[in-house]
Amino acid sequence: FPLPCAYKGTYC
């Protein structure tokens, strides 16, 4: 599953 990224709280 995609992990949360530090970009606008989106996912990788």
Swiss-Prot record:
Tissues in which the UniProt entry reports expression: Expressed by the skin glands.
Annotated keywords: Amphibian defense peptide, Disulfide bond, Secreted
Disulphide-bonded residues: 5-12
Superkingdom in the source lineage: Eukaryota
GO biological process, one term: defense response
GO cellular component assignments: extracellular region
Subcellular location: Secreted
Annotated protein name in UniProt: Riparin-1.3
Biological source species: Crinia riparia
